[in-house]
């Protein structure tokens, strides 16, 4: 087999593996929580240079004291001085409290509070159900996400908040509603409503929002149904999974020089057949596992994160 053919086969296998993994990971947010979360056991050798950084950050239950500071990239960084989104607000409720992932930069906290109030008015929802944001000090997570590391990402359920206070048990047990048809080619018309478009549109029109990740079938519906001003559609990016929630990512806040910016998405609607060709291809919708399973990718170590993340881990807890 010649070199181009080998390369082509490797690329196809890699895409298949990515498709399988990416469709599995978002399902984690649908996993049920517990009313009695057990603390993780102490690490035998926390200074082991080969230890996965997620084991260190996953054991921090409180943020650092001091001013908020974003360090690194969305998928490779941490945050100092994170703030906690109150678990219940006038127009939002936090889900899966046992995960302790309702922390973020104050800019994200302000966005969620403002956005939930706007959606209550524009979409008629009682409020938003908020999923994973970040850990108290950000960093890699033991389960679930590759990003959400610097306090600038948040998952919002596509299920309206009930018009009542959810119990702690309901917040651990309740599941979000699947928005995508079983064939993955379009939204489920029995679940999707015009209010869902209004919710995502309101989020996309926020100036601080840089990207919103949704399933390709949801992006397809938005392209089809959006009327009038469509200038916000370019922020909506198709992604594996994301079929019962959408993922909001905001820009690096001013005054955070250590925050690594992401290249903005192309300034176009992204609604052409060419834009959807990959996402609705057979290799993505029905990926075949490679004949030889790939070796697991080594986890990120503390040495691979920005140097200041070591200080974030060592800093004293903020007073509660």
Where in the sequence are the language-model features?
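Solvent-exposed N-terminal domain segments of exported/luminal and surface proteins
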Residues: 33-68
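Active-site acidic/histidine clusters and adjacent loop/turn architecture
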Residues: 66-130, 192-202, 206-209
């Amino acid at each position: 087999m010649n070199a181009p053919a080998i390369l082509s086969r490797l690329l196809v296998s890699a895409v298949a593996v990515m498709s399988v993994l990416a469709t599995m990971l978002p399902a984690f947010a649908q996993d049920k929580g517990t009313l009695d979360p057990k603390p993780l056991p102490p690490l035998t050798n926390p200074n082991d240079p080969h230890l996965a950084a997620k084991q260190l950050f996953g054991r921090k239950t409180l943020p650092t004291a001091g001013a908020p500071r974003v360090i690194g990239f969305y998928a490779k960084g941490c945050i100092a001085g994170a703030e906690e989104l109150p678990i219940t607000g006038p127009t939002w409720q936090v889900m899966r409290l046992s995960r302790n992932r309702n922390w973020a930069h104050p800019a994200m906290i302000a966005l969620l509070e403002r956005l939930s109030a706007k959606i209550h008015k524009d979409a008629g929802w009682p409020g938003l159900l908020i999923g994973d944001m970040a850990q108290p000090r950000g960093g890699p997570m033991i389960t679930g996400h590759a990003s959400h590391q610097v306090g600038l990402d948040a998952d919002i359920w596509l299920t309206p908040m009930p018009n009542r206070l959810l119990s702690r048990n309901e917040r651990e047990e309740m599941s979000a509603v699947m928005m995508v048809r079983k064939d993955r080619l379009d939204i489920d018309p029995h679940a999707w409503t015009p209010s869902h478009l209004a919710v995502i549109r309101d989020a996309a029109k926020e100036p601080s929002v840089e990207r919103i990740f949704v399933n390709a079938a949801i992006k397809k519906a938005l392209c089809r149904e959006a009327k009038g001003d469509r200038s916000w559609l370019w922020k909506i990016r198709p992604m594996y999974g994301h079929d019962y929630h959408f993922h909001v990512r905001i820009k690096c806040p001013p005054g955070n020089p250590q925050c690594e910016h992401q290249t903005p998405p192309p300034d176009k609607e992204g609604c052409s057949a060419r834009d959807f060709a990959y996402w609705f291809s057979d290799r993505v919708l029905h990926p075949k596992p490679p004949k030889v399973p790939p070796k697991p990718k080594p986890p990120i170590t503390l040495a691979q994160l920005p140097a200041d993340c070591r200080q974030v881990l060592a800093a004293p807890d903020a007073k509660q």
